[in-house]
Amino acid sequence: MILVIAEKPSVAQSIAKVLGATSRKDGYMEGGNYIVSWCFGHLVELADASSYDERYAKWRYDDLPIAPESWMFEVTKNKAQQFKVLSSLMKDKRVTELVCATDAGREGELIFRLVYDKAGCTKPFKRLWISSLEDSAIREGFNHLRDSKEYDRLYEAALSRSKADWIVGINGTRLFTTLYHKKLVVGRVQTPTLAMLVERDGKISTFQKEKYFNVHVGEGDLTADLEKVKTEEEAKRIAAACEKKQAVVSSLKQETKTVNPPKLYDLTTLQREANRYYGFTAQQTLDLVQTLYEKKLLTYPRTDSQFITDDMEDTARQVISIVCRQLPLFSGVSITPDIARVTDNSKVTDHHAILPTVQLEKQDVSALPQSEQKILNLVGMRLLCATGEKHTYAETQITLSCEGYAFKTKGKTVVQNGWKAVEELFKASLKTKEKDDPVKSLPEVHEGDVLDGVSASVTEHFTTPPKQYTEDTLLSAMETAGNDQFDDDTEKKGLGTPATRAGIIEKLVKSGFAERKGKSLIPTKDGCNLVCVLPEQITSPKMTAEWENTLMEIERGKADADAFLSGIVRMTGDLVKAYPFLSDAEAQRFGTGKEEIGKCPRCGSPVYVGKGNFYCSNKECSFCLWEENKFFSSKKKKLTKKIAKELLDKGWCRVTGLYTPKKPQLYDAVIRLDDSGGKYVSFKMEFDR
């Protein structure tokens, strides 16, 4: 029998249906000479540092850097049962070969291979590589299963990425956490992304707005401008000089311009536009596209290509026709698609651009959740636009000369709306309308025409600061980060991959280093402080972009994985050496993160709230008040934070409701600290006289 392993149960179910594996078992399906099972994402992962040595369970500066010579792997907590199922199936004597049917990409390859290796499996396996979960695509994929060796380098790159993230994350996080006494999460891609947010925020906070003035002259429907005059006095002087004077059309240029259709969606571009049009976060968009993929309504989501292959031309035409029939928004659209414009075999590596599938023909779109309908409309719109006609317009540029000054204006007239007609139809359906540049048409004039008695006016303006990043603009910045450091022949990857960028943004928010305000992403105080204290090799998008390019070269067989990891180990070692200690003031940059309730009666240091106790912050001092202690427990009372604060402040505290076995009723008393400096703190009780 053949064991097929998918990435998640829903995908396994789609595959099992096609293969005829309809008999449900515990953790798998069986039938037709196939057993189909699944992972739940990553079932096996790199082991925690404490698995290598018990002393790593505590975070200590002296233990850094941590760099395993031989890597260990462990089954992900709470997923042990499914790993047990897969391991048992791999060892089943009926199984003679396997099919890796996890997602067709770097992470999917890693998910399967780690389970395969951890289970100690040596049986041969092949690779299912598909871009759609439609029945026809699954059948085609199983008819053309690929040799697993074709993906050894993909696995090598995935494992290298995982190890690099572990080395940078474990060492960077432990280093700066122990130095600053606050958990500071450092990540190979996460940290330079945060640095971009902080840099933008800094530019905004230090921005000094400058005033400038525009002078306008005109007659009737024709107005031209002299922009960015520095002073109001000068602007008013120019306006006064031109008021009621003659203006001559000294220059008139007319040019027909073309705006080519946009490319098809890759994941990042789709996430950007879903954020701009709908306000969806990158993670929300990825989740929605993944759901639609599993419903067989969209092709594979985690792609970085914006093209299709030439053998997909007939399918693309069919899908365009289905989109116009099935999506009510485009029901009136009629186009003659130019498929050649979106076809380029050389620009499709693992997966083609995101498209609707022919399965859309059978779907009642109105029955889908609104959020899924929005994504389908967006992808459908882009397909129609990308294969539509060019948008052409006539642009007119006019210069008016008046009293020695040149005033300019520009207008345009649409010649052929082309693909923009579909985009305008889509934008008109949005609740929040996008502010497009208004199309300004100009009256017909000729060079040399004279305007008599023009009017002149002055308007005041201010320079504007850069805008905070939205997920749209941050994704764009991540995609191009560090690109200027590479030559034109280098394939550039930026920060992260289409599959990981959404998760990186979410980690920044969950770690408390960034927050969302409306559509904007803004660094928090802790986020700004973290970037300030980290060295450039950790915060630099350039270095991380170089790493991403090296990973891509490992995947292509052009770089060595061991050399890549050795370089990262050296970098983290240098990082630890560069931070041997901090001044007391610098160590308090992030605050203690602890609640102080008073001063230690022994040494005067702050006393903090701990887990079940109130302890002196001075490590050389042993003073500690325990919530559950013999004295208070005997009186059926707990030493609360309020009592502890009073004891530290005054040395005594009046406590009510104390218990004694000698009398049936409760009593009140004054409790005093009676500390002699020993291992345990003593108390003394006094009664009212």
Please report, for each region that a protein language model flagged, where it lies by residue:
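Intrinsically disordered, low-complexity regulatory segments
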Residues: 1-159, 166, 465
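Amphipathic alpha-helical transducer elements in NTP-driven molecular machines
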Residues: 9-16, 33-36, 40, 76-87, ...
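Conserved short loop/turn motifs at secondary-structure junctions
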Residues: 1, 101-104, 181-183, 254-263, ...
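C-terminal or mid-to-C-terminal helical accessory/interaction module adjacent to the motor/catalytic core
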Residues: 93, 135-219, 254-258
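Metal- or metallocofactor-binding catalytic centers and their adjacent structured scaffolds
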Residues: 232-265, 271
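Basic, low-complexity terminal or inter-domain segments flanking catalytic cores
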Residues: 2-3, 79, 90, 173, ...
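Phosphate-rich ligand and nucleic-acid binding surfaces
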Residues: 221-223, 253-254, 324
